[in-house]
Amino acid sequence: APFVRSSATFHFAVDGIDATRETPFRVRYVPRRINAAGEGVADLAAVAVYEGVVAARPSEDAMTIAVVNCQKSFTGDLRWNEQGLWFPHAAVARHVAAQEPHLLYFAGDQIYEGDLTPAITAPIKDALLDYLHKWYRHGWSFGELTRRLPSVVVPDDHDVYHGNVWGNAGVREPETGDLTVQDRGGYKMPPEFVNAVHRTQVEHLPAPRGEPTLEVGITTYHTTLSWGGGSFAVLADR
């Protein structure tokens, strides 16, 4: 699979998995380096391996869904626990695991752009690295769950470095009157950034229904998911 630099992702699909049983998986990444002769060679000392399981389809009689959203990492003087620092959300992950869910639903604000470090919004190369740094925190917090449970993820406003997102087919409206960039239509970040967020958060979902890309160039992800005894609509309602 080709490497997508802006989102630091590889995208691939595996067919023929037996949904009636748990199936182990293993993803192996072998980076390449340039040797003294200027040739690209495998860097076997830096091989990375990621392992988990594809869960068996649950019974149609009952299914438990864990819903997680708005994962703040730090709130300054506001303390909802003994430290006021929630990352890496160990208590949340532990309590979710204790419920033994069959499906995870991350309902938005998987990150907050200003948490722990200020948001970088330009230039685009630096903004993408800033986002990836904060997205990796999400994997750090919930990776032990997502490596063994199917997950539905829906981005919200802070995932795309926005305080509010007001539809308008993604088209950024001009600033008028007292409507700031946060409160007018569309995304304030460019399509390249929004699409990188989509590749990291929603690319694993079933293929979108309808047009895969808006006129402004932003990808879509509204789709359907059937799992166990449930049939779900995944909506991009921002």
Predicted segments — roles?
Residues 1-238:
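Metal-dependent phosphoester/phosphodiester hydrolase catalytic core
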